[in-house]
Amino acid sequence: MLFRSLVLTDEAVRSLDTNVKMNPPLRSADDRESLRDALRRGAIACVATDHAPHARHEKEVPFEDAPFGVTGLETAFAALHTHLVLPGIVSLETLLERMSAGPARAFGLPEPRIEAGITANLVVLDLAGEWTVTEEGFRSLSANSWALGATLTGQVAKTVADGRVVFER
């Protein structure tokens, strides 16, 4: 399940902002609510992002000429935390399970765990940090995000992969 389908609806496309031109396309509010319900019930096993960055010039064209795709790595957790966890739609535990153990199972990887003797692969989260999404905050090659200008709560503070800190805010 792509995280943006749990947050946005097809109403966002009315602006013809090329940063909301994505595939699969956004759906109705009723569809979004059905997906949220499926997430709550456990029918959705993992939530991810397809992260499709595009150069600015590719998106600064009329809507119909712009390529499909948006970034998502920098905003996925914060958007879901803000729009699903804080209003009580799903628990933090459910969100974290669907964004970590769920994808690991889907790809046949060992489920993440913190244990002595196990090489660390984890993120440290700042659950209270409120921030505004700006182009300068992106580490990706581009910032073609539907979330530009949005205020979100919660963000990744540190990422440890194979026992090494690979990102730190």
Regions from the PLM with identified roles:
Residues 31-35, 109-111, 145-146:
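A generic local structural motif
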Residues 62-65, 119-168:
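C-terminal cap of metal-dependent C-N hydrolases
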Residues 19, 41, 46, 52-128:
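His/Asp/Glu-enriched, well-ordered alpha-helical/loop segment
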Residues 20-30, 67-72, 145-151:
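A short acidic, glycine-rich active-site loop
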Residues 8, 168-169:
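Short helix/loop capping segments that flank catalytic or ligand/cofactor-binding pockets
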Residues 12-47:
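A conserved active-site cap/scaffold subdomain adjacent to cofactor or substrate pockets
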Residues 8-14, 57-61, 135-137:
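Short acidic, glycine/serine/threonine-rich loops at helix termini
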